[in-house]
Structures are given as C-alpha cells and as structure tokens.
C-alpha cells in the first residue's frame, strides 16, 4: 500500500521509503518525466519485497551452522559439497529449499504483473518507462523477455526517384484501411473496383420462416474463434428479423379522392382539422337520429325491405260450391210402385241436408283461414318493428348516422325510389345477418350531389358505381361490420 508520504507499509507494520530517484527528471536528459502508474507501483512493491527477503536470507546465511561463502557455488548446485558434518548438510539443504521457493515466488510475481498489465490500458510513454525500469534491475530482465512482441507496422510503397521506398502507415490514416481491404481482396481474388455498385442486401425474412442459428457447442471455447462465430451468427439473426404487425392494429383509412370533400371537416380530407383522429361521428355536423321522424318516413317510402312478406294468399280458397251434380232427379218411371218412390224422396232429402251441413262447415273453415291470415299480417307488422329496432340498436352501438343510399335511376317507374335496387347484408359480431339500409358516415354528400330529389340529408342519391367504388376501395372499415355486399336486383 502506497501512503501519501511515499512509503510502502510492510506486513510487520514498518514503512519502507520508496526510491523516487528513478521518477525524477535528470538534468540534461531528453526523456519525459516518469509518472507513477499502477504498473510501476506494483513493480516497486515487488522490489521492496525482494530486498526484504534478501536481507532475511542473509541473516539466515550468517546464523546457519557451518555455512561458508567459499563453497556457495556448491550449495547452489546441490548443497552437498563443503562441510563434512551433519550440521553443514542440514544448513545447505535448508538453503537449497529456500532458493527453490524464491524462484517459484518470482515466477508467481511475474505472472501477476503481466496479468495486471493486460487488464489496464497504458499509453506508449508508460510502456517505454516500464522498459527502462526493466533495464535498471537485473531481476526484471526475465519480465522483458516474456513480454509479447509488438506487431510490425504496415508499410506502404512510395516511388521516390524511380525507387520503391517503404514508409510506415499511421494507425489513423485511411490508407491503412484501404491497404487492409486490398490484402483481403487479394486473398479472395476480388479486384478492387471503386466503380462497382454496392451489392443490394437481401430482403430480411420473417421470424416464422427464419430459424434461429445453430450454436456449435462442440468446439472448444478456449479459443475465442468459436464464440465470435456464434455471436456473429446471432447478431445476423437478430438484424434479419422483420418486426411483425400486431393483429389488431388500427388502420387509418385514406382520405377521399373527391374534390367535393376537401372543404369538409370530416376527418379524411387534407385540410381537415380532425385529420386521422379516428372520429367517425362529429355531433356538430352529423344529424342525430330521431326514431319517430326517420322511421315513419322510411316506412312510408317502402325503403326497408321485408323478404318474408307472408302474404298467405291461401290459393286453396275452399270454395266448396258443391254443385251436387247428383241432382237426384229420380223421375221414377215406375209409377206403379208409389211406396218405393216415397222412400227414394226421403233419401234425397237426407242427402240434401247432409250437403248443407258440409257447406256450413266449409264456411266456418274459410272464416278460420281469414282469421289466420289476419294473425299472420299482425305478426309481419311485429317483425317489421323488431327488425327496425334491431337496426337502431346496431346503429347506436356503431355510432353511425343513418344515411340510406338509394339509386337515382329506377328500372321501373311504378316501383318507389330505391325499391329492390340495392341490398346489403350486415354481419354482426355474433354472426347474425341483418337486412338493413347501408350506413356510411357521409352526410355532406347529399348537399353537393347533382341529384337533389329530397332535402332530407340522410337520404343520399347516387349511382351504383359510386357506391361500389366506396366499398371496394376500403374507405369504410368497421370491426363490427365484417362484410359488405352490394348487388343489383
């Protein structure tokens, strides 16, 4: 630990001063002043530890029995030469063990220093200073040998007076990048043609069609190449994913391509204030729906169709005229048998009474049929009312104004306007088809249309081609209305 006063705290608590002479700039030297970096601090701590150990080793040498400086070489070799006594043998053995431990400790410290330097990023000046420190001490010579060699700088060819001259390329120049690209292209056999256009990137596939990349787990992860390949594959997979659209996204309908609507504030035109806010109904412009007024007018004009008329014409009128072709004249040519004639007359009278009873029964049946027809007509009226009520409920739920599209050109003069010319089938969310007039949020069309036959803004007169163009172009989209169908009668 380095204190502010420049000392190293030892394990026993004592402070050893640091020799800062190597960090001071000498007079007359062109070298820069050294800086106290973490790497240099680590080296200083290592030097101090080694000096302390050397002192302890010297004390051990002095205190060891029979130790002599003259036979130090024999002790280094094996510790078996020199003294003949067992004490000398024990002392030399202890010294050899300490010497081996010392070498192992130095190796460990060297590895720690190298690993520490790999983690930290030092400038070139710091590396030069470290090299000078290594030259200053004998123990750091091995550290210098173990350092990895710097890669040779790329060279470029410059023709000077017809001779090629090699000059180093700076790391930040564009020529270095171009040189690297040329080398790669030479290996791949590709000519460096600047005029060539860049290849178009393939269109990314969707997530469903593109499987995730296979990561090779069999390769050794000690070498960084396999991890780099897997990460590159995974990055390529991520960037090739096309974002999927949400199923229930809100589609903004396009503005109407009719000049008449550009002045209207209906949410579709370019000049509209409510552009793209999704407002299908504006209470300031749209006429509210009145049940009493609108439905009465529609029923009078026979706009709402009822396919199930249930006329019940009752083709079997059951006239039962009972002409009684068997008039039973019975002229009774046999005048002599009067009794027989009387019996025949009685039989005929009975038959006539029977026929009269049948006629009365038939008349009663006809009355019952008429009552049934009246009931059917009442039911039809009720059905008409309920269908109108259902249409009103659907209309209120959708927040649509009741605009009824009819055709201005009628095929027959006797039929009322819009009768059996346009039929629509609206399908609700429950799947039940509802026969109803077409509802679209365009009340302003009637005010500017050429065919103004009625002042009612809810009644729109137009031709079938315009109606088909609206529904086929997708201008009207509703979640509850899943299907529109328009057909001529």
From Swiss-Prot:
This is Putative uncharacterized protein DDB_G0287265. Disulfide bonds: none annotated. Residues 1-94, 109-229, 300-389, 428-461 are annotated as: Disordered. Residues 155-164 have a biased composition (Basic and acidic residues). Residues 121-138, 308-343 have a biased composition (Acidic residues). Residues 43-53, 64-77, 344-389, 433-449 have a biased composition (Low complexity). Residues 144-154, 173-199 have a biased composition (Basic residues).
């Amino acid at each position: 630990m380095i204190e502010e006063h420049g000392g190293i705290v030892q394990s026993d608590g004592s402070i050893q001063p640091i020799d800062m002479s190597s960090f001071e700039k000498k007079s007359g030297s062109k070298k820069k002043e050294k800086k106290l970096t973490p790497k240099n601090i680590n080296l200083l701590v290592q030097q101090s530890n080694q000096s302390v150990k050397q002192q302890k080793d010297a004390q051990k040498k002095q205190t060891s029995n029979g130790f002599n400086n003259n036979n130090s070489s024999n002790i280094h070799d094996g510790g078996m030469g020199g003294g003949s006594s067992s004490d000398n043998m024990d002392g030399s053995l202890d010294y050899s063990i300490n010497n081996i431990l010392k070498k192992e400790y130095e190796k460990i410290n060297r590895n720690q220093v190298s690993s520490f330097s790999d983690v930290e990023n030092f400038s070139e000046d710091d590396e030069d200073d470290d090299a000078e420190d290594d030259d200053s001490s004998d123990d750091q010579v091995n550290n210098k040998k173990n350092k990895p060699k710097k890669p040779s700088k790329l060279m470029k060819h410059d023709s000077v007076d017809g001779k090629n001259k090699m000059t180093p390329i700076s790391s930040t120049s564009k020529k270095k990048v171009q040189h690297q690209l040329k080398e790669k292209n030479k290996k791949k056999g590709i000519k460096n043609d600047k005029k060539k256009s860049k290849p178009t990137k393939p269109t990314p596939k969707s997530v469903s069609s593109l499987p995730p990349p296979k990561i090779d787990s069999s390769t050794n992860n000690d070498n960084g190449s396999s991890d780099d390949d897997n990460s590159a594959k995974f990055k390529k997979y991520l960037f090739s994913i096309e974002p999927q659209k949400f199923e229930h996204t809100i589609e903004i309908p396009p503005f109407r391509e009719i000049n008449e609507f550009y002045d209207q504030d209906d949410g579709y035109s370019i000049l509209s204030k409510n552009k793209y806010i999704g407002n299908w109904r504006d209470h300031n412009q749209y006429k509210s729906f009145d049940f009493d007024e609108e439905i009465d007018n529609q029923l009078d004009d026979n706009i709402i169709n009822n396919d199930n008329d249930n006329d019940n014409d009752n083709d079997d009128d059951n006239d039962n005229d009972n002409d009684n072709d068997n008039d039973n004249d019975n002229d009774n040519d046999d005048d002599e048998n009067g009794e027989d004639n009387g019996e025949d007359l009685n039989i005929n009278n009975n038959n006539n009474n029977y026929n009269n009873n049948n006629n009365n029964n038939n008349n009663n049946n006809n009355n019952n049929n008429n009552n049934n027809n009246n009931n059917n007509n009442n039911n039809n009226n009720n059905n008409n009312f309920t269908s109108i009520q259902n249409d009103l409920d659907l209309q209120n739920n959708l927040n649509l104004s009741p605009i009824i599209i009819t055709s201005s050109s009628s095929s027959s003069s006797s039929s009322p306007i819009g009768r059996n010319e346009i039929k629509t089938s609206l399908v609700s969310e429950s799947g039940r088809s509802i026969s109803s007039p077409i509802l679209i949020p365009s009340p302003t069309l009637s005010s500017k249309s050429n065919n103004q036959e009625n002042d009612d803004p809810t009644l729109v007169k137009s031709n079938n081609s315009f109606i088909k163009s609206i529904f086929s172009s997708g201008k009207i989209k509703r979640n509850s209305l899943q299907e529109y169908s328009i057909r001529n009668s």
